[in-house]
Amino acid sequence: MNTVVLRETHGKVGLIRINRPEAMNALNDAVADGIAAAVDAFEADESIGCIVLTGNEKAFAAGADISVMRQSSFDYMHAYKTDFVTRNWERIRTARKPVIAAVAGYALGGGCEFAMMCDMIYAAENAKFGQPEIKIGTLPGAGG
């Protein structure tokens, strides 16, 4: 069971919650795979009318998991060829049901781009969007 992505049903709404609070919901392969699986499940469920993607009150998603990128074995070229972080994002864009990003707290880098992949963004008053990749010497993974 994928515990970094939680799936709930509330009436006709399918809720997908990124659940990595210790890492400010930083995105990694497990998160990307879990979100894609949840979207697939809600798409197959005829009782679901829309899908809401969210994080927690501190962070929607604070971008790519930089701790993975800092590992000496991390290969940037391989990461871009294999769609590190952005893998499965196309699944959100192609969903037949509307996907709404409910953003509270930080949506930075890949988290900001992830929210932009949704059909609509509902931003809380404390939502903060940004593309800080330049500060670590890289470009936005999905183009910004």
Question: Model-found features: residue ranges?
Answer:
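CoA-thioester-processing core
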Residues: 88-95, 102, 108-144
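Conserved CoA-thioester-binding segment of acyl-CoA-metabolizing enzymes
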Residues: 1-56, 72, 90
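Buried hydrophobic positions in well-ordered alpha/beta secondary-structure cores of metabolic enzymes
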Residues: 16, 20, 98-99, 129
